[in-house]
A protein has these predicted regions:
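C-terminal helical cap/extension that packs against the catalytic core
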Residues: 194-216, 230-234, 299-302, 308, ...
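Glycine-rich phosphate-binding loop signature in dinucleotide/nucleotide-binding domains
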Residues: 127-133, 269, 320-325, 393-401
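Charged, amphipathic alpha-helical linker segments immediately N-terminal to NTP-binding catalytic cores
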Residues: 1-16
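Acidic, Mg2+-coordinating active-site environments of NTP-dependent enzymes
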Residues: 110-111, 118, 131-138, 154-239, ...
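A conserved segment at the C-terminal end of the G1
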Residues: 44, 52-69
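ATP-dependent carboxylate-amine ligase catalytic core
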Residues: 18, 22, 26-38, 63-152, ...
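Nucleotide phosphate-binding/pyrophosphate-handling subdomain across enzymes
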Residues: 38, 134-137, 145-158, 162-163, ...
């Protein structure tokens, strides 16, 4: 088996026809020696901000001197990004070796595991093999029935900002979504919640009380944003002052406040995490594809906001960083998202749209998306490929700002096309 065939094997099994549940993951991990039982975790769920918060947690724990695993999805440029230890992606050779280990166990199962379940098993094997002190584990979808939820009670569960997304899988109300996310709360294990949505907060508080899990809600009244530019946003939170965060979205200090709150909970449980490590970890964190500046002048931004809740935060960041300016938007949206609300948020800031389809069957076609924009009074033209779309958006932008957004699934392709254009 080589790297390409290993990836082919991983991607061969999709969700279709599989009943949600943890039994397949448990069976697979048991056949592999239950590597997850040797590990300690911070488990992160939420609608938006969970990847950024997970990256911040991992960076701070590493700065405190721990060996830290980080498990996230989706990837931006290469699959290996999803499984990292101390900021280093799993090597191609190690990935191939672990797929060769997982394949016979997976193939022997009557109810074969899904792609995400196989990747979760690969992550657990790698984190155990590399002797991680702690793993920051990002949920794939929901919480209760997500394959990451096979773990024993974590050192801390973290629930980031909640909003309406994945309603088909999780349910049509915020209470349903909160209930799925609250599934990661384990008996006696502390939980940190971003809060701010009463309907969801009530569900999380009730679940935490039922499971005797100490709950801390992030106190955003202690957050002050001092300054923000195209290099960093400076903020104070709960006694930590003047932190320069290189993730420049206006919403990122709120994610940082969530991470700091969780790190202090870990500290109360005996983890040695001084404030100096929290500061260092936040000031050197990297998390591609989230309000990321690929070029300062003229501005070219890349953002992975993929639902109305995330788009609202991105639009606020655009208003904060570029007051009064109009953008050329390079846009791709999944057909199962709230296209109406996403377009309503973007149209007031748009001079022009260039639409593309990300390389996934869920993507709305470039033509359909352009028609939807025109029907709402916007100017839009479809591009046949992402490469053509990037070139066209840059040409239309001239000296003005361009922002590529709508899904994480095209971030890697946009970055590659933009780099090629600027060679």
């Amino acid at each position: 088996m080589n790297y390409e065939s290993a990836l082919e094997y991983i991607h061969a099994v999709q969700w279709a026809g599989h009943k949600p549940g943890l039994s397949r993951t448990r069976t697979l991990l048991a056949a592999l020696g239950d590597p997850h039982k040797k590990l300690r975790f911070v488990h992160v769920a939420g609608t938006n901000g969970k990847g950024s918060t997970a990256a911040m947690l991992a960076s701070c724990l590493q700065a405190a001197g721990y060996r830290v695993g980080l498990y996230t999805s989706p990837f931006i440029n290469r699959f290996n990004e999803r499984i990292q230890v101390n900021g280093e992606q799993i090597s191609d050779d190690a990935l191939v070796r672990l797929v060769e280990q997982v394949q016979p166990a997976a193939d022997a199962m009557q109810d074969v595991p899904t792609e995400f379940e196989i990747i979760t098993a690969l992550g657990m094997l790698w984190f155990a093999e590399t002797k991680c002190d702690i793993v920051v584990l990002e949920v794939g979808l929901g919480g209760t029935l997500d394959s990451t939820n096979v773990i024993d009670p974590p050192e801390c569960a973290v629930i980031t900002a909640l909003g309406m997304d994945h309603v088909k899988e999780l349910g049509p109300t915020l209470a349903d979504i909160a209930s799925a996310k609250a599934g990661i709360i384990k008996p006696g294990s502390p939980v940190v919640s971003y809060g701010g949505v009463p309907e969801a907060d009530a569900v999380i508080a009730r679940t935490a009380a039922e499971r005797h899990a100490p709950l801390t809600v992030v106190d955003l009244s202690r957050l002050t944003i001092e300054d923000g530019d195209l290099d960093a946003v400076t903020f104070d939170f709960d006694g930590l002052n003047g932190i320069r965060l290189p993730l420049i979205g206006s919403y990122q200090p709120r994610n940082a406040a969530t991470a700091i709150t969780a790190l202090r909970v870990l500290r109360s449980r005996g983890w040695n995490i001084p404030d100096s490590a929290i500061r260092a970890g936040l000031e050197q964190v990297r998390w591609p594809g989230r309000f990321e500046l690929l070029r300062h002048s003229p501005v070219f931004l890349l953002d992975g906001s993929h639902n109305a809740h995330g788009m609202r935060a991105t639009v606020q960041s655009l208003r904060d960083r570029f007051p009064g300016q109009k953008f050329v938007f390079l846009l791709s949206i999944m057909a199962d998202k709230d296209v109406d609300e996403m377009l309503a948020l973007l149209l007031p800031l748009a001079g022009q749209f260039v639409t593309v389809a990300a390389h996934t069957p869920r993507a709305m076609s470039a033509e359909t998306l352009a028609e939807q924009i025109r029907a709402r009074g916007g100017r839009a033209e479809p591009a046949s490929t992402i490469e053509a779309g990037v070139a066209r958006a840059v040409a239309l932008g001239g000296t003005g700002p361009v922002c590529a957004l709508g899904t994480l699934y095209f971030s890697g392709d946009v970055r590659e096309a933009f780099a090629k254009l600027n060679q």
